[in-house]
């Protein structure tokens, strides 16, 4: 069962010239008394659900014109869902360019779901039986807890009942104390065309940016990579920190959303999770040789890893140098997007992925595309120099992709394609153009720094939380979330954690190495996606495809089923965390009173 609150907001706003009743919306964990002060008159905000600290209320404001714009006008007269003590509610992140000219974007997913709007940090509140939740947190069993879940986005609220909530990867030997989580919605409930979500703790990465950034790049490359965004998680009223909310590619929820836009065929194809050894190597007479491909339990007719035998046999028998033979194989396997994935695996030194490690991949056979196989990629935290254990150490950035087939011979799909002159030329074209416009210390660093500045207040909150579960705690500090942008850092608890490279340091070094090898002239200003006139936009000012905090943004309708109840809009005022919250408003100016 799901309830949704959605309010349509105006697409653009200038200063209001008349008095209006404005609805204020505030997320204030631990607050017991929330008020807004309008020209000195206090108006109380209230929370309708005692388990969700989401406070709303209306107040009359005057029509004095201001020298700046506010998103309080138009149809809604409502603020965005502000989070207490966060200076920016809705950001203005620079968007990445599209390096590939032909089929530049993956369109089968439809419009990007509003829940993955990267300019806003949603808040997730799960509430379940206290004794079961305590057991889940303290003892980390594989059990699931059923309860209610509220997802608060920029200008909407989704609430769900009968949600199955638990630890992702429970029972693994080296889990972090900050666990990863997952939840599944019940029945026909969906959010953004999905019913299953994964929250990754990002503890391997002090910046908490790498995995999200990797997915950002893959989307700019026109792939069907999982969608991601940062969220705040609260369980039974307690804050558990910041997490990367993303699709789990091993679940049909991801397939339904990214391949079919929420309208899947009556019967889906088989889906597989690639564990260590998922390499596409042919095993004649030994079907168990494909056992590293773990079938989804809901595969139609229980189809298992034996499904890979015809595919791997065909690849083994293909003359890689023959374009006709490659074209015939492409009727079975999508090489186009696979090459795009491999470009980014190479550029980021994704040692825990397919090419270098033959792991953390997956595959889906699409019945709506003549049963063609699609490669899936996942788990992007071990990238951009994190835990990179190679003989060359930092000199690894200069290792050419041309050396990868001999270094990593089990990556037979990538290695075979590079034996074909046309595929090798295409790979190199994608690689060099990506470095020229995107993967460099100009465009990509511009986005990294914008993301970091936006996330920083939440990272400070996250680093202040004492996790309650058993497991590894590297002890990364708030200061290291910034320091690891520029240089390597060591885990304060001296128990692992291999952030030897700074994130920006790695991007700059790798792009310079590529520019030297291929004689690439990198752009001098950040580049954005194509504008309506077909030319690339500059994002030197922080991006021009989204509006800044304090401005209005076009509203998007709810994509999930269930009744719509209401909605919210946005504001960028500063807040302060205390048990009693008092917001000061003079006319349309929302400021914090300390």
Curated annotation (Swiss-Prot):
What triggers production of this protein? Expressed during growth in host lung and brain, and during growth in presence of epithelial cells. Induced in presence of high free iron (at protein level). Induced during growth in high glucose (at protein level). Induced in presence of 3-hydroxybutyric acid (BHB) (at protein level).
What is the protein's membrane topology class?
Lipid-anchor; GPI-anchor
Region annotation Disordered: residue ranges?
529-565
User: Which UniProt keywords are present, listed alphabetically?
Assistant: Cell membrane, Glycoprotein, GPI-anchor, Lipoprotein, Membrane, Signal, Virulence
Q: Which GO terms describe its cellular component?
A: plasma membrane; side of membrane
Instruction: Tell me its applications.
Output: Antibodies against CotH2 protects mice from mucormycosis, and thus could potentially be used to treat the disease.
Q: Bias category Polar residues: which stretches? A: 534-547
Q: Please note every region of biased composition (Low complexity).
A: 548-565
Give a short account of what the protein does. Promotes invasion of host epithelial cells by adhering to receptors on the host cell surface to facilitate endocytosis of the pathogen into host cells. Binds HSPA5/BiP protein on the cell surface of host epithelial cells.
Question: What protein is this chain from?
Answer: Invasin CotH2
Q: Which species does this protein come from? A: Rhizopus delemar (strain RA 99-880 / ATCC MYA-4621 / FGSC 9543 / NRRL 43880) (Mucormycosis agent)
């Amino acid at each position: 069962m799901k309830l949704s609150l959605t309010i349509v907001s105006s697409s653009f706003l200038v200063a209001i010239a008349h008095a209006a009743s404005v609805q204020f919306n505030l997320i204030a964990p631990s607050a017991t008394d929330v008020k807004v002060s309008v020209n000195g008159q206090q108006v109380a905000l209230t929370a309708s659900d005692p388990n969700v600290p989401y406070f709303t209320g209306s107040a009359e404001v005057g029509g004095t014109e201001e020298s700046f714009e506010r998103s309080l006008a138009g149809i809604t007269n409502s603020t965005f869902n502000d989070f207490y003590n966060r200076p920016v509610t809705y950001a203005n992140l620079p968007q990445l360019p599209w390096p590939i000219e032909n089929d530049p974007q993956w369109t089968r997913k439809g419009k990007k779901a509003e829940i993955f709007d990267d300019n806003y940090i949603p808040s997730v509140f799960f509430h379940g039986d206290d004794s079961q939740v305590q057991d889940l947190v303290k003892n980390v069993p594989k059990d699931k807890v059923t309860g209610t879940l509220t997802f608060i986005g920029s200008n909407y609220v989704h609430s769900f009942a009968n949600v199955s909530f638990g630890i992702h990867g429970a029972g693994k030997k080296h889990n972090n104390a900050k666990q990863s989580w997952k939840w599944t919605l019940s029945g026909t409930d969906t959010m953004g065309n999905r019913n299953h979500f994964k929250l990754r703790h990002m503890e391997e990465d002090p910046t908490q940016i790498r995995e999200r950034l990797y997915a950002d790049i893959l989307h700019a490359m026109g792939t069907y990579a999982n969608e991601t965004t940062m969220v705040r998680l609260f369980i039974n009223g307690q804050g558990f920190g910041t997490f990367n909310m993303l699709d789990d590619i091993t679940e049909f929820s991801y397939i339904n959303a990214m391949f079919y836009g929420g309208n899947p065929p009556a019967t889906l194809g088989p889906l597989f999770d690639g564990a260590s050894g998922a390499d596409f190597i042919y095993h004649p007479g030994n079907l168990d040789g494909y056992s590293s491909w773990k079938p989804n339990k809901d595969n139609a007719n229980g189809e298992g890893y034996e499904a890979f035998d015809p595919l791997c046999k065909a690849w083994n028998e293909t003359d890689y140098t023959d374009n006709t033979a490659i074209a015939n194989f492409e009727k079975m396997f999508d090489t186009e997007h696979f090459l795009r994935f491999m470009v980014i695996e190479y550029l980021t030194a994704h040692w825990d992925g397919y090419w270098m490690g033959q792991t953390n991949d997956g595959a889906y056979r699409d019945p709506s595309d003549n049963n063609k196989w699609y490669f899936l990629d996942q788990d992007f935290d071990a990238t951009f120099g994190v835990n990179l254990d190679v003989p060359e150490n930092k000199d690894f950035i200069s290792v050419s992709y041309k050396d990868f087939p001999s270094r990593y011979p089990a990556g037979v799909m990538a290695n075979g394609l590079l034996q074909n002159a046309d595929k090798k030329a295409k790979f190199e074209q994608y690689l060099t153009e990506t470095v020229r416009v995107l993967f460099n210390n100009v465009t990509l660093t511009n986005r990294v720094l914008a993301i970091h500045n936006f996330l920083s207040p939440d990272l400070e909150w996250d680093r202040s939380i004492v996790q309650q579960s058993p497991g590894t705690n590297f002890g990364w500090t708030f200061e290291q979330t910034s320091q690891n942008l520029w240089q390597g850092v060591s885990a304060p608890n001296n128990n692992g954690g291999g952030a030897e490279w700074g994130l920006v340091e790695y991007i700059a070094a790798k792009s310079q190495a590529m520019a030297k090898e291929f004689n690439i002239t990198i752009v001098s200003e950040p580049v954005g996606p194509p504008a309506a006139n077909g030319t690339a936009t500059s994002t030197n000012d922080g991006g021009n495809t989204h509006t800044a905090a304090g401005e209005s943004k076009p509203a998007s309708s709810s994509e999930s089923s269930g009744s719509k109840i209401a909605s919210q809009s946005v504001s960028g005022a500063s807040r302060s965390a205390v048990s009693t919250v008092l917001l000061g408003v003079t006319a349309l100016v929302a400021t914090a009173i300390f």
